[in-house]
């Protein structure tokens, strides 16, 4: 078994060693629930990484949105370069579920656009879990949605090895059985090609852009090579490789044959129910739709909306659908990041899905079995937990109630303390805010301002700009790349102020920010709850000059709770620093990322490569652009938007050079 190897320049510091030890001890004692209550910037991810390494168990880390999941994915990839770190989130770019609106007698067909790159990462996730134990999966709420049988997926594995007696046709039939398609032109992802006694396949389940080339002689495999998927360059020989299905919805044809009479039986029962209750239209509608699906299943083994028959096809006898949790070994560890938000999100998934599908069943569009293609109920999710660590700066009632151990992680390795909080009456707040901004600008520091509405953020930004402040607003109407560009401008000091609404959602941990101003801090609501206020205060906790100003009309209960908790933590941190002679230092975070440096280095050689390509000494430049476009798509799907911006600009630059050359 491969052990987890943690790569880091640093050792645990501050409260991290204590937190690691106490949580590990609790897990080793067999406790199911434990909580890591860590302040912003205390290195909770590094603590989790150390726990995974020390306990040496597979781990699932769940977050409440794709952006934060992507950040965690990148961090764990850096921490564990020699282990399988995977990413499992929704693969839909656009999704309109099948639904029926009785008041309008309107049936809406399912429409979806699947993101192929995220789908690849999902396949890699289940493949890694089927092959090895040293796996860390970072996921979202997608982890509780229905998947195929893990047993069927594992049994789909086929090994190919040098010396194996097998024909080209037999290999081809196996590939087709595993849902791979043959291509007669260029080799593409999840397809295979045959040329004489050579068969090549590019499985997306493999990490890295490479394919396999199998060479046969008289129905015997004599050589297996790994080759570059783009250039076909030989990357070296291998004695064997294992191929899994390209889908985690593996359905043996025998299961399809066995399911058909069960579906027919339930169809007769439901049609009779409708007729007995005078619903003749519903009975006829259901009969037509299901009989058409049955005919497709008999002829092809597939039908549109086959997921609605998963109860019959999956072989599950558990009374619930399979999901990602079922692909993990029994001793896995679960980490719920930002649990105060993630747990309520998981709790709410089932009800919304159920109410939509119930209409489809009641009006004869689907059999009752369609209700079983669903996300898990919360108690089912809880039952699948082996041992869990809830991770949050502000744990909710459930975490506090269930946990055998709650460990505070208050001391930051950097020595930084929670920001000072000042409360000021809202009278004259605009003038006061402008003065505070000017103070920060003079120190070359940045400012975040949080409002309650989009209109307020836009109006305040416009007002500040008229006063000569370099400011931009940030809210959901900006697309993802635009939001990243605004954050990048702030870090580069091209603007000094960002005005936003829910700055927590943006994941704004920017060390240059020394002032967070909270307008209408006393208003009642989610964005001004004690939990949200504490989280917002944390945005100023990465700078040694951190300050938070709350503007109010009347100090609220939530304000008082947030201030008291922050001051409690702040005093503990100050006392620790005095005792250990620590001087807090602002976190230094490089603005230029690693990929941007790599691309700059690549760019130095682009003109050189270009000249050689023009003279016929290199491959076509189109392939280079295709490669960069592929990297761009991966960057966007991984939520590495700063990288995506850099790649986009390089592609544009390279493309313009090509057009100039063609016009010469």
Swiss-Prot record:
GO biological process: nucleotide-excision repair; SOS response
Assigned keywords, A-Z: ATP-binding, Cytoplasm, DNA damage, DNA excision, DNA repair, Excision nuclease, Helicase, Hydrolase, Nucleotide-binding, SOS response
Domain Helicase C-terminal: 429-595
Ranges in coiled-coil conformation: none
Chief place where the protein resides: cytoplasm
Record-listed ATP binding positions: 38-45
Pfam families according to UniProt: Helicase_C, ResIII, UVR, UvrB, UvrB_inter
Localization (cell): Cytoplasm
GO cellular component: cytoplasm; excinuclease repair complex
Transmembrane segments: none
Database matches in InterPro entries: Helicase/UvrB_N, Helicase_ATP-bd, Helicase_C-like, P-loop_NTPase, UVR_dom, UVR_dom_sf, UvrB, UvrB_inter
Residues of the UVR domain: 622-657
An example molecular function term from Gene Ontology annotations: excinuclease ABC activity
Task performed by this protein: The UvrABC repair system catalyzes the recognition and processing of DNA lesions. A damage recognition complex composed of 2 UvrA and 2 UvrB subunits scans DNA for abnormalities. Upon binding of the UvrA(2)B(2) complex to a putative damaged site, the DNA wraps around one UvrB monomer. DNA wrap is dependent on ATP binding by UvrB and probably causes local melting of the DNA helix, facilitating insertion of UvrB beta-hairpin between the DNA strands. Then UvrB probes one DNA strand for the presence of a lesion.
Family of this protein: Belongs to the UvrB family.
Domain notes: The beta-hairpin motif is involved in DNA binding.
This protein's name: UvrABC system protein B
Organism: Borreliella afzelii (strain PKo) (Borrelia afzelii)
Lineage of producing organism: Bacteria, Pseudomonadati, Spirochaetota, Spirochaetia, Spirochaetales
């Amino acid at each position: 078994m491969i052990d987890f190897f943690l790569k880091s320049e640093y050792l645990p510091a501050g409260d991290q060693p204590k937190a690691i030890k106490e949580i590990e001890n609790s897990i080793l004692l067999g406790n199911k629930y434990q909580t890591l209550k860590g302040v912003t910037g205390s290195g909770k991810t590094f603590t989790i990484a150390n726990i995974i390494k020390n306990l040496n168990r597979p781990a699932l880390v769940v977050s409440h949105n794709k952006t934060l999941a992507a950040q965690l994915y990148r961090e764990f990839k850096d921490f564990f370069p020699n282990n399988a770190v995977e990413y499992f989130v929704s693969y839909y770019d656009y999704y309109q579920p099948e639904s029926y609106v009785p008041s309008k007698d309107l049936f809406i067909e399912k429409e979806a656009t699947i993101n192929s790159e995220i789908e690849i990462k999902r396949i890699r996730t289940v493949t890694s879990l089927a092959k090895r134990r040293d796996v860390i999966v970072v996921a979202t709420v997608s982890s509780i949605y229905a998947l195929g049988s893990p047993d069927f997926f594992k049994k789909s594995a086929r090994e190919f090895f040098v010396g194996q007696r097998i024909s080209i046709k037999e290999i081809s039939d196996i590939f087709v059985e595993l849902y791979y398609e043959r291509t007669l032109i260029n080799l593409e992802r999840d397809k295979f090609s045959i040329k004489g006694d050579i068969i090549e396949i590019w499985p997306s389940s493999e990490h890295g852009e490479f394919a396999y080339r199998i060479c046969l002689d008289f129905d015997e495999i004599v050589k297996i090579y790994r080759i570059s998927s783009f250039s076909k360059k030989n990357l070296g020989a291998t004695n064997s490789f294992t191929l899994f299905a390209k889908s985690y919805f593996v359905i043996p044809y025998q299961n399809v044959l066995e399911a058909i009479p069960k579906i027919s039986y339930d169809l007769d029962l439901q049609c009779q129910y409708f007729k007995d209750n005078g619903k003749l239209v519903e009975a006829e509608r259901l009969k037509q739709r299901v009989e058409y699906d049955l005919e497709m299943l008999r002829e092809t083994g597939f039908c549109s909306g086959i997921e609605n028959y998963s109860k019959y096809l999956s072989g599950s006898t558990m009374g619930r659908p399979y999901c990602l949790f079922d692909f993990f070994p029994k001793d896995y560890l679960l980490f719920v990041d930002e649990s105060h938000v993630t747990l309520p999100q998981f709790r709410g998934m089932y009800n919304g899905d159920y109410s939509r599908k119930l209409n489809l069943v009641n009006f004869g569009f689907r059999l009752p079995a369609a209700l079983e293609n669903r996300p898990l109920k919360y108690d089912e999710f809880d039952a699948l937990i082996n041992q869990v660590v809830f991770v949050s700066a502000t744990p909710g009632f459930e975490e506090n109630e269930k946990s055998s151990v709650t460990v505070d992680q208050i001391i930051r390795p950097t020595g930084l303390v929670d920001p000072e909080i000042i409360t000021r009456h809202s009278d004259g707040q605009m003038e006061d805010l402008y003065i505070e901004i000017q103070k920060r600008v003079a120190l070359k520091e940045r400012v975040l301002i949080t409002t309650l509405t989009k209109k307020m953020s836009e109006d305040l930004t416009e007002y500040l700009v008229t006063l000569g402040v370099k400011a931009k607003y940030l809210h959901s109407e900006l697309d993802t790349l635009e939001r990243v560009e605004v954050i990048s401008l702030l870090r580069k000091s091209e603007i000094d102020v960002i005005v936003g609404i829910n700055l927590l959602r943006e994941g704004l941990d920017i060390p240059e920010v020394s002032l967070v101003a909270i307008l209408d801090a006393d208003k009642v609501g989610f964005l001004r709850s004690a939990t949200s206020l504490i989280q917002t205060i944390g945005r100023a906790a990465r700078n040694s000059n951190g300050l938070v100003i709350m503007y109010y009309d009347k100090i609220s209960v939530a304000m008082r709770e947030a201030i008291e908790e922050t001051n409690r933590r702040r005093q503990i941190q100050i006392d620790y620093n005095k005792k250990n002679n620590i001087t807090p230092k602002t976190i230094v975070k490089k603005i230029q990322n690693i990929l941007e440096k790599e691309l700059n280095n690549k760019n130095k050689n682009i003109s050189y490569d270009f000249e050689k390509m023009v003279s016929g000494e290199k491959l076509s430049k189109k392939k280079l652009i295709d490669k960069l476009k592929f990297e761009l798509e991966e960057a966007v799907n991984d939520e590495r938007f700063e990288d995506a911006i850099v790649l986009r600009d390089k592609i544009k630059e390279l493309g313009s050079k090509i057009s100039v050359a063609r016009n010469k």
